[in-house]
């Protein structure tokens, strides 16, 4: 473990407490919590950043008003004060990660760029090859729109969205879909193809390439931070496991 991040378990736990955590698979998350607290202990963030962090949290959890917030707190079994502390903690983690890994963020982005592509596409799935061919020719000849045909014939959930899927990460769906979408042109309609048990007709609506903005930079820094934390936790557990299993003289 890094010299700057040592943990004296005796200051946190009795032997019974340690045993309880291990037996209930909580030890790893416990050590992680201590390490994160140590790492961000000297990080200070402005009131503006705190407010922004809470607003982002509300937005991402679709909390629009006080009533929504009250419901969220009730189902989460936490108080507003506890929620605010957790949001501030996460904001400090992001700030720490940005300060420490800022110079590595672009390299990680370039390595992850392909996986971060977003896509919007239209899809119709049917178990019948003949029907898939008929659908394809109707769209190609503009006899009927893909949206209308999706509602009529698609056997997947996309029938409820008029065939439209996305924006979603291009890697979210079937790997073969991602491969096809990457080589298609905007507006291009695929001929029927077999995907598992489905015959599919697909059209690329939009491919969204990621850009290295501040949000993405923060995401890359946070990913590197998470990896380092996991490595530190695993290293700590391994070393302590070796100590406990070492023969006594």
Regions found by a protein language model. Name each.
Residues 2-60, 68-127, 131-134, 148-151, ...:
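PPIase-associated folding chaperone regions across multiple families
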Residues 155-165:
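Gly/Pro- and small hydrophobic-enriched strand-loop and loop-to-helix capping segments
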Residues 135-139:
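Surface-exposed, Lys/Arg-rich phosphate-binding patches that contact polyanionic backbones
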Residues 141-142, 166:
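Short, surface-exposed, charged loop/turn segments at secondary-structure junctions
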Residues 165-168, 181:
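Short clusters of hydrophobic/aromatic residues that line enzyme substrate/ligand-binding pockets
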